[in-house]
């Protein structure tokens, strides 16, 4: 495992890290070519089938639901779909829907206006706006509260959202990828 991790690293830095060394390492990382999907995973028939499916759906600019048990690489598949798509030069924004406090979900995903609630001292873009032109990955989509699901539907159907505290639609161009480890039909 240690060798496999080391093989995927660009450079190993040891603490304390000199700022110039860190800057150089980050520059090398940015300049490095993006990872090719064919280098991911094994050569089993199942993995070859997964890779073929990722290639097939990468440029289909529709939402994709990725299902599977925890730890099976759903986020890796989402990254691959983004990297293989025409949106690869734009942001990839991932969020675990179960990790956001229910009271903050709307603001985190869709943004808010100044004064929309106590503590909202400035207008803030949500994750969808920050990913404009790119991809939003909603991990554990089944944990998304019902009210946020309604607003997500608007993004999917109309390509617009409303920030919390506003009634003015904001146009967004994002591809939505979602993942879950549960059977959503049975949930």
Where would I find each of the regions flagged by the language model?
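N-terminal accessory segments that target, anchor, or regulate ATP-driven/P-loop NTPase machines
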Residues: 1-35
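AAA+ ATPase active-site-proximal loops
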Residues: 34-171, 176-183, 187
């Amino acid at each position: 495992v240690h060798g496999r991790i080391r093989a995927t690293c660009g450079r190993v830095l040891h603490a304390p890290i000199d700022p110039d060394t860190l800057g150089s390492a980050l520059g090398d990382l940015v300049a490095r070519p993006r990872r090719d999907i064919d280098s991911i995973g094994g050569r089993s028939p199942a993995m070859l089938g997964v890779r073929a499916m990722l290639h097939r759906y990468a440029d289909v600019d529709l939402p994709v639901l990725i299902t599977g048990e925890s730890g099976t690489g759903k986020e890796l598949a989402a990254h691959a779909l983004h990297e293989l798509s025409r949106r690869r030069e734009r942001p990839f924004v991932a969020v675990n829907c179960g990790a956001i406090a229910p009271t903050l979900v709307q603001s985190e995903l869709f943004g808010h206006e100044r004064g929309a609630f106590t503590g909202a001292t400035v207008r803030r873009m949500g994750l969808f706006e920050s990913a404009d032109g790119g991809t939003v990955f909603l991990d554990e989509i089944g944990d998304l509260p019902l009210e946020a699901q309604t607003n997500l539907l608007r993004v999917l159907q109309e390509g617009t959202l409303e920030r919390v505290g506003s009634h003015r639609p904001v146009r967004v161009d994002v591809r939505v990828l979602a993942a879950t480890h549960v059977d959503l039909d049975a949930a």
